[in-house]
């Protein structure tokens, strides 16, 4: 994996307004290729807004976002996958009336020539094999034929991850990947994230402090829309400002 000093994602002087309310205040930071980074902060810190800006959900009011040196600040969200960026959102987004295998196959088909009406049978066989491989990767091989709507919540989240991986992303953005999960499901998801981090850059938003402290190499702490601190878990634990506004609340 490329672990050079060149950032895979660079946020430069980003601010975001909603009317007169300023949700993000002049945030500048870089994300290195190969790093697993968590964005944390108390409620109202601006985490969701920041995630939406870097994932293309909303454009910054000022400042820029660059992916591999390319300005993506105003890129249409549907072009992110082709650029090499995949997203997994807090609210599970799967086709509940389709099987787990069909969900992943649909995601794979969207990455191929979508305007080709007639495809060789071999192409479908290849897509099916790739879908099976992704289901194995996320631990859903035994649920291949189950309807997505019949899967447990944690399994649906894992299925969504498989769909996100269908585009072979260099960067995976995850919003609250363990939201609504049982302790057992959380362990499974965090293990999956750890495995994926060996192959790609991951940026996630997460409220469960103990999980990110033990999993991530780097943390960003937001507070009232400002970047309060960034660094290793040890750096964040020892930061007096972080203790005051966030860690001290738990």
Feature annotation, model-predicted:
Residues 2-250:
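Glycine-rich phosphate-binding loops of nucleotide-dependent enzymes
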């Amino acid at each position: 994996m490329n672990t050079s000093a060149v950032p895979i994602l660079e946020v430069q002087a980003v601010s975001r307004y909603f009317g007169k309310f300023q949700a993000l205040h002049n945030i500048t930071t870089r994300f290195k290729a190969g790093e697993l980074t968590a964005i944390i902060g108390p409620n109202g810190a601006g985490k969701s807004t920041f995630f939406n800006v870097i994932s293309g959900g909303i454009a910054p009011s000022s400042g820029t976002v660059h992916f591999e040196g390319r300005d993506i600040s105003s890129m249409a969200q549907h072009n992110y996958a082709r650029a090499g960026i995949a997203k997994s959102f807090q609210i599970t987004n799967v086709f509940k009336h389709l099987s787990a295998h069909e969900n992943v196959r649909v995601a794979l088909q969207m990455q191929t020539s979508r305007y080709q009406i007639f495809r060789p049978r071999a192409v479908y066989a290849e897509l099916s094999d790739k879908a099976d491989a992704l289901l194995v990767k996320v631990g859903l091989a035994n649920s291949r034929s189950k309807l997505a709507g019949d899967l447990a919540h944690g399994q649906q989240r894992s299925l969504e991850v498989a769909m996100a991986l269908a585009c072979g992303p260099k960067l995976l953005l995850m919003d609250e990947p363990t939201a609504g999960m049982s302790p057992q499901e959380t362990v499974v998801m965090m293990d999956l994230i750890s495995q994926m981090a060996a192959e790609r850059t991951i940026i996630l938003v997460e409220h469960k402090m103990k999980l990110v402290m033990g999993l991530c190499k780097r943390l960003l702490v937001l507070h009232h829309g400002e970047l309060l601190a960034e660094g290793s878990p040890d750096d964040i634990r020892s930061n007096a400002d972080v203790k005051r506004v966030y860690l001290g609340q738990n």
